[in-house]
């Protein structure tokens, strides 16, 4: 019962925060009913997806202080599991998605055990290495389409197909990912108040002290890493049905892993709202830059340069990101 109360308990936030959150939530619910372009709808779906990626990264990277730069490998496992099972055996999304999550979590336990013997930059580099190795394996593995990837053909089905997540109108995809988005917020709100959440924050503050208090540091990290993996893999499965054309080069790229981490850091790692704020800033910017400065102006990669500049500027002002700046302004007003 206490765990259930923690899910819906936002009392540690100021009332003004909850008012703003309520207004944003209302806007997200009614957005498809307002006049909008297909570009705006696609951007909003990307925002919700990357918010969830960021929430997952934030559990291990924000609350645990472990900089993971290999999250795209789990996105790929979820995406390719769903695509392979749908194309080869006509398995519905609601069956293939949990299987993809289970496979991704299993892989996270396999590599997490040795990875979390490493610390600091060594851990970050190791996560990059494991992700790139898995991407290379997928690029030569014919069963998952190798480098050419896989394509889910909507022609085979009669949309709207809620079992396989095949739709002609993006509004269906929007409300499904919005549901996952709200559930993700509730889960992270529970996690940060859970025993594991407190253990992670203790480990982040001082690993030796946490160990002296009886916390199994290694196991706490591995469990949290699995939770972060489940978030990313779940959205990866959705990604396969939404995009319909997936390739290892795009789905499991290092750029994608870095972007996921940057969003949480920009918004405020270790805070509930940080990944959402980060996605709210970077995803519209990403969509605009790729549409107008990338493809049309021929400035390939300009988006990554601008992300780096933004992160450096924010970090120079407040290392805890945009949420840290908001809290700093509040403290000054109280003083």
Locations of the language-model features?
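Transmembrane alpha-helices and adjacent helix-loop boundaries
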Residues: 1-335
């Amino acid at each position: 019962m206490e765990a259930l109360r923690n899910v819906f308990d936002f009392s540690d936030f100021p009332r003004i925060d909850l008012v703003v959150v309520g207004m944003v939530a209302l806007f997200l619910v009614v957005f498809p009913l307002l006049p909008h372009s297909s570009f705006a709808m696609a951007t909003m779906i990307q925002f919700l997806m990357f918010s969830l990626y960021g929430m997952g990264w934030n559990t291990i990277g924000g609350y645990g202080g472990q900089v993971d730069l290999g999250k795209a490998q789990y996105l790929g496992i979820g995406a390719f599991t769903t695509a392979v099972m749908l194309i080869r055996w006509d398995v519905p999304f609601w069956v293939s998605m949990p299987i993809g999550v289970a496979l991704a979590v299993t892989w996270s336990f396999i590599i997490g055990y040795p990875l979390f013997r490493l610390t600091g930059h060594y851990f970050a580099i190791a996560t990059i290495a494991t992700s790139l190795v898995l991407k290379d394996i997928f690029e030569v593995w014919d069963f998952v389409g190798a480098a050419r990837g896989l394509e889910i053909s909507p022609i085979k089905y009669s949309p709207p197909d809620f079992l396989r997540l095949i739709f002609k109108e993006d509004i269906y995809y929007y409300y499904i990912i919005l549901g996952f988005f709200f559930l993700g917020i509730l889960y992270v709100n529970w996690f940060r108040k859970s025993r594991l959440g407190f253990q992670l924050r203790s480990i982040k503050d001082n690993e030796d002290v946490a160990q002296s208090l009886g916390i199994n540091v290694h196991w706490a990290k591995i469990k949290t890493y699995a939770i972060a993996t489940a978030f990313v893999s779940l959205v990866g499965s959705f990604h396969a049905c939404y995009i319909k054309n997936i390739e290892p080069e795009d789905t499991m790229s290092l750029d994608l892993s870095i972007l996921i981490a940057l969003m949480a850091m920009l918004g405020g790692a270790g805070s509930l709202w940080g990944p959402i704020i980060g996605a709210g800033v970077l995803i519209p910017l990403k969509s605009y830059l790729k549409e107008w400065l990338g493809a049309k102006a021929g400035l390939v990669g300009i988006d990554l340069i601008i992300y780096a500049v933004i992160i450096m500027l924010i970090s120079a002002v407040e290392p805890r990101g945009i949420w840290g700046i908001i809290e700093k302004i509040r403290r000054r007003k109280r003083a």
